[in-house]
Amino acid sequence: MKSENNSVPIDHVIKVDNERHIRVWETFPKNQCDKRNNTIVIASGFARRMDHFAGLAEYLSTNGFHVIRYDSLNHVGLSSGEIDQFSMSVGKKSLLTVIDWLKSEHGIDQVGLIASSLSARIAYDIVADVNLSFLITAVGVVNLRNTLEQALKYDYLQMEIDEIPEDLDFDGYNLGSKVFVTDCFENNWDTLDSTINKTKNLNVPFIAFVANDDSWVQQHEVEELMSNINSDKTKIYSLIGSSHDLGENLIVLRNFYQSITKAAIALDSNLVGLVSEIIEPQFEALTIATVNERRLKNKIQSKSLA
């Protein structure tokens, strides 16, 4: 892993079963002298590609972090598969594959995980079984059934699987309903209780960010999850003025970047909280990173179509 241009991520390909692959982007610390103890893995939410988190990667790398992003299998983005075949278990497999790749192929054992929205539910599922340094979630789903009901305006999980419409629109994409719902029931992804059971023995430092105007994730359910964790290394913070869409405007987006970075720096130093100061990337640097990533994505997509 070597970088010659810190404004362009390094593109990696992890081969998985049946000639499929997971695409990974790696961003190095801007100043090697100030690099942190942990590598950060960012798990994007549903219908979000890794390039949607260019700004967060820029904030974290400006503040000394080595950052890894990836696109899940059967999802939007550059990895194999189509989003109408996505399931929570496929998302789990993708995240575990990336973490194992870091550890086995590159000897990186100190890993902090940042997961948003639907990917947070996946993070909650693996956190007790994977050797992480810390976990940060943002608008993290804890009650998948309730979130789906809020997003889809109806509780489709009460229906027989054969009766569920196959072309449900979830956040602008066609959710392969039968694949997704079957996996939810077979692998216990759907309830708040299932999430609590997965996290009650969590023993790594954990900070959860909720949004005070989030109709998809209920703050009291996140608080219930936290209260059932047998650890004193947890905290919850509110992103004031935000809905579930953390990119709805520049003020909300900047607050999200700042808050996550403050939490990551604190947790990297074994403190459960937020540091008071961070280095703010220049607007020009954020713009350059975004443009370069868009070009890289287009280049990769063009090659795959050739």
From Swiss-Prot:
Annotated metabolic or biological route of this protein: Lipid metabolism; fatty acid reduction for biolumincescence
EC number: 2.3.1.-
Key word Acyltransferase present: yes
Keyword annotations from UniProtKB, A to Z: Acyltransferase, Luminescence, Transferase
InterPro entries in alphabetical order: AB_hydrolase_fold, LuxD
A molecular-function term among this protein's GO annotations: acyltransferase activity
Active site as annotated: 117, 214, 244
Record-level GO BP terms: bioluminescence; fatty acid metabolic process
Keyword Transferase: yes
Superkingdom of origin organism: Bacteria
Xref: Pfam families: Acyl_transf_2 (PF02273)
Main enzyme class: transferase
Membership in a protein family: Belongs to the LuxD family.
Function field: Acyl transferase is part of the fatty acid reductase system required for aldehyde biosynthesis; it produces fatty acids for the luminescent reaction.
Name listed for the protein in its UniProt record: Acyl transferase
